């Protein structure tokens, strides 16, 4: 099944469509809701500094770096770029032209979703004080 599913996306502002796809991909690959990652560690969620706190936080740091690399391809804006992929729980397949902005962003999100699903989740690292723990 194609998981682009824009049927439920009609009321979502265009600028969040990629994050909506990433959310669906996270939930395809694993068993946790995407909300479990929004404020996790030093790198999950917006921004990121310091040393990752654990394996899951490293997944988010790697995802940030992957997006940084995707930005190097012309005017690729990962947070705005939508893409096409299929989800056959827990398998995710990115489609589209290899090397294109959409495919690069999809590959970043796919790798992160798989990494999130495999990494242990430490509840103590959710909602931490980033000023204190991420320098």
Swiss-Prot record:
Q: In which tissues is it expressed?
A: Expressed by the venom gland.
**Gene3D superfamilies from the xrefs?**
Phospholipase A2 domain
Q: Which UniProt keywords apply?
A: Calcium, Disulfide bond, Hydrolase, Lipid degradation, Lipid metabolism, Metal-binding, Neurotoxin, Presynaptic neurotoxin, Secreted, Signal, Toxin
In terms of Pfam families, this protein maps to:
Phospholip_A2_1
Respond yes or no to whether keyword Hydrolase is given for this record: yes
Annotated cofactor note: Binds 1 Ca(2+) ion.
Q: Spell out the protein name for this chain.
A: Basic phospholipase A2 6
Q: What species does this protein belong to?
A: Bungarus fasciatus
């Amino acid at each position: 099944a194609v998981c682009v599913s824009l049927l439920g996306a009609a009321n979502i502002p265009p600028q969040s469509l990629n994050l909506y796809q990433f959310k669906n991909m996270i939930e395809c690959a694993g068993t946790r809701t995407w909300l479990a990652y929004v404020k996790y560690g030093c790198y999950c969620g917006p921004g990121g500094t310091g040393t990752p706190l654990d394996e899951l936080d490293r997944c988010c740091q790697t995802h940030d770096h992957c997006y940084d690399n995707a930005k190097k391809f012309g005017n690729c804006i990962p947070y705005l770029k939508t893409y096409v992929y299929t989800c056959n729980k827990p398998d995710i397949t990115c489609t589209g032209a290899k090397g294109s902005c959409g495919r690069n962003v999809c590959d970043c999100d796919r790798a992160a979703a798989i990494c999130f699903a495999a990494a242990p989740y430490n509840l103590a690292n959710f909602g931490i004080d980033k000023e204190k723990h991420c320098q």
